[in-house]
Amino acid sequence: MEELQGYLEKDGSRQQHFLYPLLFQEYIYALAHNHGLNGSIFYEPVEVFGYDNKSSLVLVKRLITRIYQQNFLISLVNDSNQNRFVGYNHNNFFFSHFHSQMISESFAIIVEIPFSLRLVSYFEEKEIPKYHNLRSIHSIFTFLEDKLSHLNYVSDILIPHPIHMEILVQILQCWIQDVPFLHLLRFFLHEYHNLNSLLITQKKSIYVFSKENKRLFRFLYNSYVFEWEFLFVFIRKQSSYLRLTSSGTFLGRTHFYEKIEHLQIKHFVVVCRNYFHRTLWFCKDPFMHYVRYQGKAILASKGTHLLMKKWKYHFFNFWQYYFHVWTQPYRIHINQLSNYSFYFLGYLSSLLLNFSAVRNQMLENSFLIDTITKKFDTXVPVIFLIGSLAKAKFCTVSGHPISEPIWTDLSDSDILDRFGRICRNLSHYHSGSSKKQGLYRIKYILRLSCARTLARKHKSTVRTFLRRLGSGLLEEFFTEEEQVLSLIFPKTTPFILHGSHRERIWYLDIIRINDLVNHS
């Protein structure tokens, strides 16, 4: 790790031109081994069949030795094909799977270097304090609280995918100037495309860049989304500028952007220049806000429904002409905020209208004034959460708690710890809900499922098990969230979690959405 840190501290321009040699460094594969195969807080662990960690480290050294050989990648793909069609061999399968997994994970770590350096330098240049808080998912809801109450319409956008793999490589060309590294990426993507088109006839057959190689594909997808968001901001700024200038001046500005090669505006301007001055003049809206997480985005505006429809069809043309992606109209829904609840980041969000009457006294005359205030409201999607719990075998589809038979081989402390961790994570994530009744129901399901699992392990009933050990066994870890909140708020504050249903708390340390919450 120290060697990688020393490399990162070098000149940024050199790193962009010399990323390829990192593929031959042992510490890169060791880092990929720790993050990819042993699991981390961001990625699920991948099982290495029949080998422990020490054996895996030995295989890492063997991989580095083999990668120096000529035509190693081609032979790796051929081995994968032979395992699929000629006959299954456990050893050949393992080495092929392990090597492809390690190379892809290491490739993902290396390709993230220029972006991570640019991100850190940006925050240091802007002197943004506590910029880590901006990574929190809950920070999005604080933004929505401030902005959505003043807007009229919202568009739910499902970003189209996939796009052509060659476009992904072209997107990275403006950030990475290492030509051999880009050629290697192109080789991997084309091999993945060819192998992915074949039928899988064996249960354990895993090929290069299968779905287990999530880190690289997430990076490529984020690069694609960043590209279209960058151009969307460009269009947005031009639409605001258009009414202040003539079409001729605007075309002059597009020629200026056409000269900026590293921003990849050239092709975009050539395609869109013909209709920019005809379409963007009616897209001006100074009150427009955009929020995205993963493949879903929200575009809110204070404009009219006609304006939102124009933006909708503009997005379709933009995706089609620039990214060569044909998308369907159902991927963008336009709704009025006053009577619409949208699902985003594990919450059901809506605008609550509060009607009130104010008596106004002027001299001897008095009259009533009806006022309407809007408030951003978030609630727990109970039905979605019950569906996730049912899929994870904690309850039935109707919400009836059941035992988890797979966990009965664990110790009692491990079972309690697993259920308690799930419950605390859900309570922590949904602390911003204005109504806690639904969250109490979810906690009740997990609590009773834990009791049924323990009773099944000891071949007893839930009532007998709780009578013998006491109900405090389950109370001990389920109330940890409430104990923490009682320390934050003084006793004089009328905040009691079980009594109040309107208090909301947003945390700035949540950087990953829980799998039970993510229904997309």
From Swiss-Prot:
Keywords: Chloroplast, mRNA processing, Plastid, RNA-binding, tRNA processing
Record has tRNA processing as a keyword: yes
Major location category of this protein: plastid
Record-level GO BP terms: mRNA processing; RNA splicing; tRNA processing
Compartments it resides in: Plastid, Chloroplast
UniProt GO molecular function: RNA binding
UniProt keyword Iron present: no
Pfam families per the UniProt record, alphabetical: Intron_maturas2 (PF01348), MatK_N (PF01824)
Domain of life: Eukaryota
Gene Ontology CC terms: chloroplast
Protein's job: Usually encoded in the trnK tRNA gene intron. Probably assists in splicing its own and other chloroplast group II introns.
Family: Belongs to the intron maturase 2 family. MatK subfamily.
Protein name, entry field: Maturase K
Species this protein is from: Liriope muscari
Name of the gene encoding the protein in the UniProt record: matK
